[in-house]
UniProtKB/Swiss-Prot annotation:
Pathway assigned in UniProt: Protein biosynthesis; polypeptide chain elongation
Gene: efp
Similarity annotation: Belongs to the elongation factor P family.
Species the sequence originates in: Yersinia pestis
Function noted in UniProt: Involved in peptide bond synthesis. Alleviates ribosome stalling that occurs when 3 or more consecutive Pro residues or the sequence PPG is present in a protein, possibly by augmenting the peptidyl transferase activity of the ribosome. Modification of Lys-34 is required for alleviation.
Record Gene3D superfamilies: 2.30.30.30, Nucleic acid-binding proteins (2.40.50.140)
Protein's recorded name: Elongation factor P
CDD domains reported in the protein's UniProt record: S1_EF-P_repeat_1, S1_EF-P_repeat_2
GO molecular function: translation elongation factor activity
InterPro entries according to UniProt: Elong-fact-P_C (IPR015365), NA-bd_OB-fold (IPR012340), Rib_uL2_dom2 (IPR014722), Transl_elong_fac_P/YeiP (IPR020599), Transl_elong_KOW-like (IPR013185), Transl_elong_P/YeiP_cen (IPR001059), Transl_elong_P/YeiP_CS (IPR013852), Transl_elongation_fac_P (IPR011768)
Keyword Metal-binding assigned: no
């Protein structure tokens, strides 16, 4: 694998640090008037999802992580594992709850997901940026109930709870941003 100096760190770069794969989320290169230049780096552990902030000297280098992202189609959840399929080879992979994490609430049948593999094992699952889900439970919106600018909680078909505008009703399909968990729009 390639080696990267700390001033080469960019968001999205996957590196090996302390024997585990990390993804760089942000990197700020600092060159003080006095002393050696350094980089302040925010990274996410790919195995657990935890975030770490580290400072590296400009001369420090780290190996690139041998991880690869694959576009796979989500098939189903059997209660213990989430099953995905490669559309080119029809090979199936299963990811455990640790790899899926909180993203399980955004997975719908036939959704194109990015599965990150390390040593052939899934370590992270990224759902599509936007999903369309049906509202299965929410409070009814009363006519003239517009005093608050907020919204109301709505339970979606996958079990996720999202704050929606007051005019949205049960049975409607809405578009949700999976990165922030926020309501985007109604789907016509």
């Amino acid at each position: 694998m390639a080696s990267y100096y700390s001033n080469d760190f960019r968001p999205g770069l996957k590196i090996m640090f302390e024997g585990e794969p990390y993804a760089v989320e942000s990197s700020e290169f600092v060159k003080p008037g006095k002393g050696q230049a350094f980089a302040r780096v925010k990274m996410r552990r790919l195995l657990t999802g935890g975030r770490v902030e580290k400072t590296f000297k400009s001369t420090d280098s780290l190996e690139g992580a041998d991880v690869n992202d694959m576009n796979l189609t989500y098939l189903y959840n059997d209660g213990e594992f989430w099953h995905f399929m490669n559309n080119e080879t029809y090979e199936q992979l299963q990811a455990d709850a640790k790899a899926v994490g909180d993203n399980g609430k955004w997975l719908i049948d036939q959704a194109e997901c990015i599965v990150t593999l390390w040593n052939g094992q899934p370590i992270a699952v990224t759902p599509p940026n936007f999903v369309e889900l049906e509202i299965v439970d929410t409070d009814p919106g009363l006519k003239g109930d517009t005093a608050g600018t907020g919204g109301k909680p709505a339970t979606l078909s996958t079990g996720a709870v999202v704050k929606v505008p007051l005019f949205v009703q049960v049975g409607e399909i809405i578009k949700v941003d999976t990165r922030s968990g926020e309501y985007v729009s109604r789907v016509k």
